From Swiss-Prot:
<keyword id="KW-0963">Cytoplasm</keyword>
<feature type="binding site">
    <location>
        <position position="337"/>
    </location>
    <ligand>
        <name>(2R)-2-phosphoglycerate</name>
    </ligand>
</feature>
<dbReference type="GO" id="GO:0000287">
    <property type="term" value="F:magnesium ion binding"/>
</dbReference>
<feature type="binding site">
    <location>
        <position position="366"/>
    </location>
    <ligand>
        <name>(2R)-2-phosphoglycerate</name>
    </ligand>
</feature>
<comment type="pathway">
    <text>Carbohydrate degradation; glycolysis; pyruvate from D-glyceraldehyde 3-phosphate: step 4/5.</text>
</comment>
<keyword id="KW-0479">Metal-binding</keyword>
<dbReference type="Pfam" id="PF03952">
    <property type="entry name" value="Enolase_N"/>
</dbReference>
<feature type="binding site">
    <location>
        <position position="285"/>
    </location>
    <ligand>
        <name>Mg(2+)</name>
    </ligand>
</feature>
<keyword id="KW-0460">Magnesium</keyword>
<dbReference type="InterPro" id="IPR020811">
    <property type="entry name" value="Enolase_N"/>
</dbReference>
<feature type="binding site">
    <location>
        <position position="312"/>
    </location>
    <ligand>
        <name>Mg(2+)</name>
    </ligand>
</feature>
<comment type="similarity">
    <text>Belongs to the enolase family.</text>
</comment>
<feature type="active site" description="Proton acceptor">
    <location>
        <position position="337"/>
    </location>
</feature>
<dbReference type="Pfam" id="PF00113">
    <property type="entry name" value="Enolase_C"/>
</dbReference>
<dbReference type="GO" id="GO:0009986">
    <property type="term" value="C:cell surface"/>
</dbReference>
<dbReference type="InterPro" id="IPR020810">
    <property type="entry name" value="Enolase_C"/>
</dbReference>
<feature type="binding site">
    <location>
        <position position="367"/>
    </location>
    <ligand>
        <name>(2R)-2-phosphoglycerate</name>
    </ligand>
</feature>
Length: 427
């Protein structure tokens, strides 16, 4: 039995210099699992609650000592002696201990740190790499990365309203070659920006954050970078957007301040459709406000056959909300953020529900990250097919890419890279 004999929670810092939660779980055999949780900047209103201290004189109120204390007291007492290999039972124990719908009592950050650390300890105990522990012998598909090479919105201090402009390498035979493609486009873009006298400073997720005059100008420049790096836009590399539309939806209008536009749901749908006609855009995330389900339906009806429409703030990795979206024909993909829901069991349930409905599942980081690379193992372990984990800079982003390289190496000849077939929702 892989009995849990010790649990240690601690406060560490994330990639933005804000506190987050880390947890160590020690088993009877002496094996240990360690996990750290991420934190978002643009968050959905229905996400599980991240417990912060609210003490203004310490880390601006963002400390997590309360969450850490919950790990070291209540949670420790509840799961001490449990079998670490019984993940579903352990997560159920955490949910019952918290007793709220949104994990507001113990904090999703406390619960997730424990859930992840237990899984890592159990994998170590079993002598399995984490991806194999999650997925068994069927885990062999590397994910197609969506690489955020230009940051805007809440992730950068510039005039771009759309939060993320991403490149998606799809023609390469392996993940290693896809990663090389992304890195080469990233460096080509840096040279173009530098030659124009534009900023090459990076945002929270490692992408550049220059002041483009419009979203159109930004996308055109990315196409130039793809060509400069020796690749073909629309063939070797596709584009993806994260609008994070909830961030610029005010008074019933989508207010693109950078372009001086105020658009209705129908008008913003047309705006996005025009971009998708002009550029090789394969995926649009959060193209409408999380509560604008009528707008989402309009967007899905217009673009859902040719563009992946990803619900992030819309679904918040929650099976109850996802089920409603599937029934109503809203979006065709879900973004999976482990800290939006707070346990691995619930995360995996959301991925499986999406797949059964023909929706894709995109495994995602948060803008506030750590060196923890668990999401890379989740992406492969559950054969998710897609991952979104930032740009080609900042070690908090690169740690996930490097872990995927290791996994591909470990898989050897049975490793596969899906390319365009990862977008099975567009068939």
């Amino acid at each position: 039995m892989s009995a849990i004999v010790d649990i240690i929670g601690r406060e560490i810092l994330d990639s933005r210099g804000n506190p987050t939660v880390e947890c160590d779980v020690l088993l009877e055999s002496g094996t240990m699992g360690r996990a750290a949780v991420p934190s978002g900047a643009s968050t959905g209103s229905r996400e599980a609650i991240e417990l912060r201290d609210g003490e203004a004189g310490r880390y601006g109120g963002k400390g997590v000592l309360k969450a850490v204390e919950h790990i070291n007291t209540e949670i420790s007492e509840a799961i001490m002696g449990l079998d670490a290999s019984e993940q579903a039972f352990l997560d159920k124990t955490l949910l019952e201990l918290d007793g709220t719908d949104n994990k507001s009592r113990l904090g999703a950050n406390a619960m997730l740190a424990v859930s992840m650390a237990v899984a890592k300890a159990a994998a170590e105990e079993a002598g399995l790499p984490l991806y194999r522990y999650f997925g068994g012998s069927g885990a062999m598909q590397l994910p197609v990365p969506m690489m955020n090479i230009v940051n805007g919105g809440a992730h950068a201090n510039n005039s771009l309203d759309i939060q993320e402009f991403m490149i998606v390498p799809v023609s390469q035979p392996t993940f290693r070659e896809a990663l090389r493609c992304g890195a080469e486009v990233f460096h080509a873009l840096k040279k173009i920006l530098s030659d124009r006298g534009m900023s090459t400073a990076v945002g929270d997720e490692g992408g550049f954050a220059p002041n483009f005059g419009s979203n159109d100008e930004c996308l055109s420049t990315i196409l130039q970078a793809i060509e400069k790096a020796g690749y073909r836009a629309g063939e070797d590399v596709l584009l993806a957007l994260d609008c994070a539309a909830s961030e610029f939806y005010h008074d019933g209008k989508y207010q693109l301040a950078g372009e001086g536009l105020q658009l209705s749901s129908t008008e913003f749908t047309d705006y996005l459709a025009n971009l998708a006609d002009k550029f090789p855009i394969v995926s649009i995330e959060d193209g409408m406000h999380e509560s604008d389900w009528a707008g989402w339906k309009t967007l899905t009806d217009k673009l859902g056959k040719k563009v992946q429409l990803v619900g992030d703030d819309l679904f918040v990795t929650n099976t109850r909300i996802l089920k409603e979206g599937i029934e109503k024909g809203i979006a065709n993909s879900i973004l999976i953020k482990i800290n939006q829901i707070g346990t691995l069991t619930e995360t995996f349930a959301a991925i499986e529900m999406a797949k059964r409905a023909g929706y894709t599942a995109v495994i995602s980081h948060r803008s506030g990250e750590t060196e923890d690379s668990t999401i890379a193992d989740i992406a492969v372990g559950l054969n998710a097919g897609q991952i979104k984990t930032g740009s080609l800079s900042r070690s908090d982003r690169i740690s996930k890419y490097n872990q995927l390289l290791r996994i591909e190496e470990d898989l050897g000849d049975i490793a596969s890279y899906p390319g365009k077939s990862a977008f099975y929702n567009l068939r």
